[in-house]
Amino acid sequence: MFKNSAKVLTRLCSSTYNISIRKYPAHPKRHYRKTGVVTSNGKFEITLDQRKLKTPKGAPFFVESEPLAIAIATEWDAQKDIIDRSRMHLTALSSTVIDNPNNLKKTDIVNYLVNYTSTDAILYQSSEEKRLKDLQVAEWNPVIEWFNKRYDVNLEPTDGLEVPTFAPGTVMNVSRYLSSYNEAALQGFMFAVDTLKSVILTCACVDRFITPEKAVLLARLEEEYQLGHWGRVEWAHDISKLDLQARLSAAILFVYFNSSNAFVKQKMSI
């Protein structure tokens, strides 16, 4: 009886208020048994059984780092009954590099990251709650000081709403550092910055000053502080934190794999 009443109510609401129910496409089922990596002309491609992987635009999927290719093949192999692309961050980043859906050039990405620095999350500290401000100063300021020393800049935190002003040379120094990376690695930078809302924390991760777990904790500092007062829904907040850690870890690995000439050495039988 309850099911019938629910159906009637849904039908009446939909017809009266013209409510449209959004239907999301179902995840495709896994259609392959095993994954592999093949190499050709210094490029590495991913195979699903005997078929080579393609990008969303239908272009041949390839990377120039063997460790990255193995990691991507592992992502596909980790899919069970269905293929959940939303959790395959290395695959998504590599496809973005190949397809370049937004037609971004290297200078576009560098400018985006440099401009983001002026609105970096950890430069804006609380002006209302003293305990929160003290926590931010204790946890965020050491990373800001490291960033200033590492890149020869002078960024200062603020507890107001005004955008911090940069000293002469700041933009040039940060741009020079970011421009030393190729376009693929910069896509990883951009993904990490969008995850953390912080260029400073991203650079600290890439340079191994802090771990991805620590970076996520610092990015969520105010949220964690509020949860300490109001309580938390364990599974919901834990899932959110772990999702950020997965996204950030994938981004940092993507930067590493596209910034080094690392290859996997296979054992040779004698």
Annotate the PLM regions.
Residues 67, 71, 104, 138, ...:
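Conserved active-site and cofactor/substrate-binding residues in soluble primary-metabolism enzymes
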Residues 15-104:
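An N-terminal structural lobe/cap that precedes and organizes the functional/catalytic core
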Residues 154, 212-216, 223-224, 230-270:
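Mature, matrix/stroma-exposed regions of nuclear-encoded mitochondrial and chloroplast proteins
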Residues 59-63, 121-124, 131, 201:
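Short cationic amphipathic helices and targeting signals
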Residues 166-235:
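An internal, amphipathic alpha-helical element
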Residues 107-174:
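Internal, conserved structured core segments that host functional sites
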Residues 1-27, 270:
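N-terminal mitochondrial targeting presequence
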